Amino acid sequence: MKMKLLGGLLAGATLIAGLAKAEETISAVHAFPETLIYTKSFLSFVDKVNEAGKGVVQIDVRGGPEAIGMFQQPDAVRDGIVDMVYTPGSFYAAALPEKDALVASNLTAVETRQNGGIALIDEIHQQKMGLKYLGWFDSGVCYNLWTRNEPKFDANGNLEVEGLKLRGNNVYNAFFTNYLGAQVIDLPTGEVYSALQRGVVDATGWTQIGLIDLKWNEFLNYRIEPCFFSTDLGVVVNNDKWNSLSEEARKIVQDVAVQHEKDSVMALRAKRDEDFAALGAAGMKVVSLEGDAKANYLAAAREKTWERMKTVMGEQPGGTGNYDRLIELFYDLNAAK
């Protein structure tokens, strides 16, 4: 009787150990604070994976920039310090200039998943950085220029930037400096509020949503149309970690990512409309470029970014071999007309 009881206990312990071992864990960090809408979107994705992956795979979020600095996160996932990162591709642009195809895109993840664009970006990530590009989240949202003071225009309707203390970053500096001729002040997102408060900057590029989350609307009074660019927020996974997961775990995570690409497009467009309404009600004014000035503004945003991409690609192994294909997959010239 004792032997049977012991045997049963051992069998039960083995079963429990097997079940515990079967549930794999992916550690993750995100680039922005939890209060920002984009981070909330990523955490929603995590919740979906953890629900679908019960007993198989779970994502363990370790935090945001307070855990690993936002600009150090791409190296951290490449080096295996963390398994997964949600971050703009622009934060590792020096290693992967092809991310500019997403920045200059007028398509969303839905179209580029279907046409092979994301598959190509994934392939390039694996080749250049040893990373699995899991998905392009929160696409379909573009950028505006936001200013404290009323914008000025020249006789031809072009935006005048002389005297503007414009905050810049890696996403839009090629456009701001090479076309607008602006002198930019590079600042990470977390430092912009205090810079606006102290008058260090009085204008910034930012996406159509999130201004209220960051409380920058306390200082910014004008939105300049048209919007330009696209968000390039994506999830990357250390390739060794990805390949070590079971086939079932990989399928769960990838399937949820593809669905979240679709869901986030609609969710963030609704959030954009909500934010615009709230900003307008609080007194935010909208000014717009028109005619040739508008067309030239949009063309420059696109072409200066492509120019930057091609230049940096040409300096790296593999050169510009994927350049034309990236533009073909991530930009619809007919839609731009």
Q: What label would you give each PLM region?
A:
Residues 1-9:
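Bacterial N-terminal signal peptides that target proteins for export
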Residues 12, 23-111, 131-337:
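N-terminal secretory/targeting leader peptides
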Residues 17-19:
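N-terminal signal peptide c-region/cleavage motif recognized by signal peptidases
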Residues 108-128:
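A gly/proline- and charged-residue-enriched helix-loop-helix capping module
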